[in-house]
Amino acid sequence: MILRPASLDDAENLARLGRESFCHAFEHLYRAEDLAAFLEEAYSVEAVAREIADPGIVHQLTEDSPGSGLTAFIKTRLESPYAEHSEARKPFGLGQLYTDPARTGEGLGAALMDWCLNFARSRGCDAVQLSVWSENYGAQRFYQRYGFGKIADIEFWVGEQCDHEFLYELRL
């Protein structure tokens, strides 16, 4: 497995993997128009390219070998958008941790999480924060294995639909 940072050349493949992963897990929850609006906002090639170019957002990718195709990714923010919910002085944000649905359970998520925690520590962060859907029990168990715990109830919007999410935090 190769672990590497994203470049602008990855925008199209990263957008595709983001859309596929999100739809595989959550498509059944939303009206078609809400899902379409969200996917355009979050996973259009242009939106992903803007994020890759943003120095405050860091994507890390996995692939089997150079050029073989993306198998998983993590999107992080150097400053958590949820800082007001914590007493941490410098919380780091974990935005997405998605794996190709056919590759779940192969350790890709664990490799990316290990990278994330080490990267946050290297940046002097004292916490990592993430949001997780209140009914995504598998993801919650994964995060809890790393020591994350719930610190708040928050909202996540997909189009005009509001989801109940949990804000998880791990103090470093």
Give residue spans per PLM region:
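Short helix-adjacent coil turns
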Residues: 9-10, 107
